[in-house]
Amino acid sequence: MIRMKHILTVLALLVAFASCNERPAVVRDTIPYVKQLAADTTGSFRLVHTYRTAGTKGSIAVIGEPEAAVQLASALLSADMVDNIDGRIAPDRLPDFAGETFDILMDLYNAPYIRLAASSPDSLREVAVRNAVIAVDSVAFSNASDPRSRLTKTRAKVFVLANSLLSEYGKFDVDTLFKMAGREAIILTPVEAMLLEARRSGCKSVAVWAPAEARSAYENAAKRLTPQMDVTVVSTTGNGILRPAFRDMLGIYRSLKPNGSLDAVLLDSFTASLEELNAEKEHIHRQITEQDMAFDRILTPHFRFIEPTAALTGALYRLLREKNLFTHDIAYPAVRYYQTEENLDGEFVPVEVSAAYLSSHTKPEPAYVPDID
């Protein structure tokens, strides 16, 4: 008995010692705005609390700065990478997202996000949360005296945050708000989609070509999602001409990693021309100059560019398939466009601009998307 007491005493001391030496878990705190919404059980939080994933009939909300949101919408509406009957990787001249409804929330009021990220990151996080609640139900911020803010829309089943900055400044807070209500928000971001696409492709070393303001978004996501992959964020400044800028990016990467090699470059841009970039890559392969030879040694034989539109399109298809969220309706994808504007309370609300927008834009050309198996 004495021996047993001695053993128990030693064990207790060891447990106490271990507890004293444990490093407390680092918990990221959400913004006051989320706590404010959670305290209001009659308003926005009630909408979130009663939220379901909206099932197969919900919409796919694409949220972001106008240019990125529209570019991504174009790719999603025209994507044709699989056979719609059996899911084989074979275009069948039918939209892959047939029957789906896309709500494109063009956040003109708060753009450019890079300004908010630099001056007030918490403000950008608040913008992301407010837009997500709008995607759940736009009446959350309606004003009885302002008819523009009283529109109704389909409840979102998936949230696509079409800006890399929202991965760092917003996604966590949107997810936290829904978790506080005991609900799940299905959220996609270009940062995570591109990193996971690189991992799926077997990349071991990649460069992320992104603005300095987006550095932490990629670095933090890489630590979570691709810890075994070497990820280097490279920012360039210049006159904006794409092909020389690509060479500048390679030069900076070479200075950072003198013996490094690249399986891919992730493009933090919805408008960069893959045609121009691939043409410059082929020019480098010809090794006409010493610089060409130096850069060619960096690029591995299977080097590729990974851009957000293709990565998000593939990620969305896989997600809908894995979670069985496809509508399975036999119809072309439906799309509605919304633009944020200031209401009478001095806050931003969505205003539908589908008619005006669709009449001024032609049907998008089919976009390339990566393999989805």
What spans do the regions from the language model cover?
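Non-catalytic structural scaffold of enzyme domains
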Residues: N21-D373
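C-terminal motif of bacterial Sec signal peptides marking the signal peptidase cleavage site
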Residues: F17-S19
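Sec-dependent signal peptide recognition
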Residues: R3-A12
